From Swiss-Prot:
Any one annotated GO CC term: lysosomal membrane
Protein name: Cln5-like protein 3
Cystine pairs: none
Biological source species: Dictyostelium discoideum
Membrane topology term: Single-pass membrane protein
Example GO biological process: lysosome organization
Glycan-modified residues: N93, N112, N122, N138, N168, N219, N268, N289, N304, N359
Keyword Acyltransferase: no
Cell location: Membrane
Signal peptide: 1-24
Family: Belongs to the CLN5 family.
Key words, A-Z: Glycoprotein, Membrane, Signal, Transmembrane, Transmembrane helix
Pfam families on file: CLN5
Gene: cln5lc
GO MF entry, a single one: hydrolase activity, acting on glycosyl bonds
Length: 439
């Protein structure tokens, strides 16, 4: 019941209509050196990454709707999440996340509901899910960070970023809810998270207690789902998981239904008008001159009956479970395990080059210690050249010629004689030990 109250409280604030903003990850612009790349421009960014740079991967989180409410939603474990790559070689760090556009509210209710001349309704939506990459990690915004993997190369990061557009193309709409069956006990709350992740190919096995009775009809498509898909992708590409005492926590909102959701025929005027009535009531809750408590109570009743979900252009009718119609959890979630298969990761063709270091400056190819030794060697060579050049000019002014122009000729000759081979001596032969030579 506590989980249900948490999610209803979250939705109460959403439907009051106070969040007409995007929940994208960072704030910044190209003017201060911060650049934003979406799925269709990521390839412009990948070739700025050096193949041999070393990275660590972090799970980063920010309180939901931080720009308006600060850390308020942190109190109920409601977070926006992403992935952060920290460059260990001094290059730019990288953050990437998946968010609802234009706003989170637009993923829940239609943009417009209009009525035609015959009194029939039409619903239009403006919602999408968008991946955003930034060459910067805003540590004020991403207030929670947890190390997940290490030993990543720049090449693996580029391969991952080339996978991200494929993910966005297959997840074009932000879907807040998973839809699952209620289990045999009617609670619908046991093992569903493990089952969902297992269906996505993440985690070592099936669900926990009760999952054998659970059917997942529809997976969500949220920021956390993108993060866990990212963990799996990086793992398949060769990332090394750190030793964690427990798996990182994941937000999950699930609607539990008593039977399989049915697709609503939008072309059926009767069914379309029922859809419109549902969403009009939903939006009307926020427009009523009522207290937050009254809105809260109306939303509770809303989640105890017939419910409609709009997912990627399709409407679904759900009959929600009475004991537990909805669940909002924030709990440890399985990480990828088992044998890796980098060939299972689909990437965008021609999105990155494996030889980007050819386009880097000379010194960017070496570590700091190597640069120090190279600098010393170059400096020593310059000193020798100057010494010989000045010495030749001085000796020439003294009337010397030929090899006598070389400064300190006797010194250089004696050094050279140390390495001169004596042709009168036998060549070195290794001493072979046998019974006669060993006394």
């Amino acid at each position: 019941m506590k989980n249900m109250l948490n999610i209803i409280l979250t939705l109460t604030i959403i439907f009051i209509g106070l969040i007409k903003i995007s929940i994208s990850s960072d704030s910044g612009s190209s003017e201060n050196g911060i650049y934003f790349y979406t799925y269709d421009t990521i390839c412009e960014f990948t070739n700025s990454i050096r193949d041999d740079d070393q990275y660590e991967l972090y799970y980063v989180q920010a309180p939901l709707m931080y720009a308006i409410y600060g850390d308020l939603f942190e109190k109920i474990n409601a977070y926006h999440s992403g992935v952060g790559f920290y460059n260990l070689n001094g290059g730019p760090n990288i953050s990437i996340d998946y968010f609802a556009g234009p706003t989170l509210e637009d993923a829940l209710i239609p943009q417009n509901i209009t009525k035609d001349s015959q009194g029939n309704y039409n619903l239009t939506w403006n919602t999408y899910g968008l991946i955003e990459v930034t060459n910067y990690i805003n540590e004020t915004y991403w207030s929670k960070r947890e190390l997940i993997m290490y030993g990543l190369t720049g090449l693996q990061v580029k391969q991952y970023l080339s996978w991200a557009p494929i993910y966005n193309q297959t997840h074009p709409v932000y879907n807040l809810f998973s839809i699952a069956s209620a289990d045999a006990s009617g609670s619908g709350d046991n093992g569903y998270l493990e089952t969902i992740l297992h269906n996505l190919g993440i985690g070592g096995g099936g669900g926990g207690s009760g999952s054998e009775n659970l059917i997942v009809y529809q997976n969500s498509s949220t920021c956390d789902d993108f993060v866990w898909a990212s963990f799996n992708t990086i793992y398949q590409l060769g990332g090394t998981l750190v030793g964690m005492q427990s798996n990182p926590p994941k937000d999950q909102i699930t609607l539990f239904t008593t039977d399989e959701p049915t697709i609503v025929d939008y072309n059926n005027i009767t069914q379309r008008n029922q859809l419109a009535s549902f969403y009009i009531n939903l939006m009307g809750i926020a427009n009523k001159n009522e207290s937050a408590l009254q809105i809260f109570q109306e939303l509770i009743s809303l989640f105890n009956g017939t419910f409609y979900c709009y997912i990627d252009g399709v409407y679904y009718e759900l009959h929600l479970s009475k004991p537990t119609p909805i669940s909002f959890t924030y709990q440890p979630s399985p990480m990828p395990t088992g044998q890796r298969n980098s060939n299972s990761i689909e990437t965008l063709n021609n999105c990155y080059s494996k030889s980007s270091t050819d386009n880097q400056s000379f010194f960017n190819r070496f570590s700091k210690i190597q640069i120090i030794f190279i600098s010393i060697a170059i400096g020593f060579g310059v000193v020798i050249i100057l010494y010989i050049s000045i010495g030749i000019m001085v000796n020439k002014s003294r009337g010397k010629s030929g090899t006598n122009l070389i400064p300190n000729k006797k010194l250089w000759t004696s050094i050279g004689s140390k390495f001169k081979r004596d042709n009168n001596k036998n060549n070195y032969k290794p001493l072979l030990y046998n019974e006669n030579t060993i006394q």
